[in-house]
């Protein structure tokens, strides 16, 4: 009995220690509809300001942001995607916990004036080697 319990404890410890090595990054993809009067440059400008503010927040220092504009595709009901990548779900959680009332939330309101990004999905992302 002790031998079996010891094996389970060792296996559990190894899994706990190995988990961070195999954990993926947190990726939030927003599907956005751009207002007809807004330009891609305006979207980029506000997204850049938002990312700068977000990087100053707890959990946001290593956030990466991407704008994806289609070249040749049937995108359905969205004009572009705003992609945010955090190095871990722990960092993403700290960032979202601090979001309410933050400078990034204030800039988010400016973004709402030129685009509607109400649909999103959270992904776990792994780099393929």
Segments from the language model and where they lie:
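Short S/T/G/P-rich N-terminal loop/turn motif that feeds into the first structured element of a domain
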Residues: 14-102, 114-129
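Extracellular juxtamembrane "stalk/stem" segments on the ectodomain side of transmembrane proteins
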Residues: 101-109
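Bacterial N-terminal signal peptides that target proteins for export
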Residues: 1-10
